[in-house]
Amino acid sequence: MKIRLNFEKTNLIRLIVAMIFAAVLYFKVTFPVYVLAGFGVSYFLIKSLSVELNNKWLRLALGILMLGGSSVMTAHMVQYLLLDAELRARIMGNKMFLNILCCLVVYLAVQVFTKNVGLTCIISHMALMIFAGINYFVYLFRGNEFIFSDLRSISTGLSVAGNYEFVLDDRAAYVVLLSALYVAFVRKIHVTFEKRLWMAVVCISVVICCCAYIGTETEGTVTETWEQKGSYRNGYLLNFALSVRDSFIAEPDGYSEEVISELEDQYSGDGESYVNQDVEKNPTIIVVMSESYADLSVVGDFLTNEQVTPYYDSLQDNIMKGHALSSVFGAKTPNSEWEFMTGNSMAFLPSGSVVYQQYISDTPTSIVSNLKNIGYTCVAMHPYYETGWSRNAVYPTMGFDETHFIDDFDQTKLLRKYITDQELYESIVERYESKKANEDLFIMSISMQNHGGYTEKYPNFNEQIRTLGASYSDANQYLSLLHESDKALEYLISYFQSVDDPVEIVFFGDHQPSLNTNFYKGLNGKGLSGLTEDELENLYTVPFFIWTNYETETEEVPITSLNYLSTMALERAGIALPSYNQFLADMQETIPAINSRGYYSVSSGCFKHLEDATGEEAEWIDRYQILQYNNMFDKKKQSKVFFPYLQNQ
């Protein structure tokens, strides 16, 4: 082996180009100037390097060393990019080793298709770092990490990406510079495996062994999706691999046709006994799922210069009002839609999955199908692009008769970049006024006005609300948006108070916003880390109400969850409950709230993980999971009693 330094003019030109790039990065991020100088010297020396390998055994050994060493380096660079020093220190040694094996699997898989080890290293390293970079920005934007199910949501993410600011920190800059040096160095070492077939066999064999070992070592390890737990508990690459594993749904314990049959016998009645409201005619039912609408006081107390939602707070007559658990935080709105409409729960699906893009292929039983079966016209409204979360395909599959997206709204009525709640509500009123005589109408609307992020300033939005004491610009913008939503809500309720026909309005938030971590720390003293189960569930709590323009009992609901709201809406509307909703109504008495993180235990007076349930609580949860699996995944043996709509198509 011969190693030489050849100082050529072309290397100076390459150095100048590299330094211009590094200088731009320096002024963007601002890191120590000695890093810039060190990069320049290192880059010039590497480009001047000449390496000759004459011995085939030396080439083989060096090739193996490059693949193994590069896997170690890349795995650590991924962790360095995503986590600060404190969080990086939390990962267990065996988990870091598994992340290195994940990298090695990628390197060896690429090597199967190339003869050149250097090319393999460049392709693999750059692919993994770009992949980590995607997660870096996804976490900045929504407060959760990028996992396997997000691959189906790329188009939706890109559609709102322009509303976010792409910012690099110093760690990201160092990773970019180090990757540039790594690529330059690897290009200087020319190692090829001549016996390509044998090389492919060895690589595939090692990949299989690595995958088997990773699978064995991670049995019982859960996919973490909260904040950065995936990266500092499992390591990001391993956590992503776990999310792939969790995309396959297993039959629940105790699942059988006999259990389904027993439940069918119990809930085959007409559901009239569950009706608690005498309504002369079917009411118009309007649902408003308000984007990022939340009551942040459930997380902790804070003061503002004026009341944020005075009208919402004033509603007291003919209303059921309270708080509900959502299964998502900061993103993945369609999961909240799905829980509300179907009565199903994300509790039994993989962490981070998006039902609209993974599990809806046939028309599911839902409030849409239930109302269509009794003659309602079902309308969906969403003032944004129809392709978001594949709604253009999902809504017709759900059974909606009409769908209205961004082109059906006045696109001059914007707050920031999104169509206002006021415009959405005016469209609801317009559709109501155009309904035919004796037409029963159901409208499912999803607003867009309050969508994150909340850092950019807009000339068309005067922020009226600000927090007192420590002030955070994103929190102020978010609270000001809620204030505008409150004004629009007053318009909607006031209009339907004046109509003669019965009307029911169901209103709830889809999830809490993702705001500055320090703002949350000011609310609960901890921020987003180190929370108890009760404190964590506070971050998944959203307000809701079911209001009618006719006389109904006023009720305060301390806690429920989105999967129960459609059942509660049917009960309050005086509509006989279908069998599945009968089951949910009974279950709610024992399990008042359930979501992707756990459930509220009445017997214990606190939130618990599903696996910690005992006694009657465990029995209800098990039956719920069995019915949901039968509904979603056992199409051949699907219950005709609980899920008749699919059978009648």
Residues covered by each model-derived region:
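Solvent-exposed soluble domains appended to multi-pass membrane proteins
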Residues: S268-E280, S290, D295-Q649
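Transmembrane and membrane-interface helices of multi-pass
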Residues: K2-S231
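N-terminal leader/auxiliary helical segments
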Residues: I3-E52, Y174-Y182, K195-R196, S205-C209, ...
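Membrane-interface segments at or immediately adjacent to transmembrane helices
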Residues: Y213-V287
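Alpha-helix initiation and N-capping motif
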Residues: L151-I154, N234-L237, A241, T309, ...
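A diffuse structural propensity rather than consistent per-protein peaks
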Residues: E8, F137, F141-I147, D169, ...
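Extended hydrophobic/aromatic-rich secondary-structure runs
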Residues: E52-L60, L237, A241, R245-D265, ...
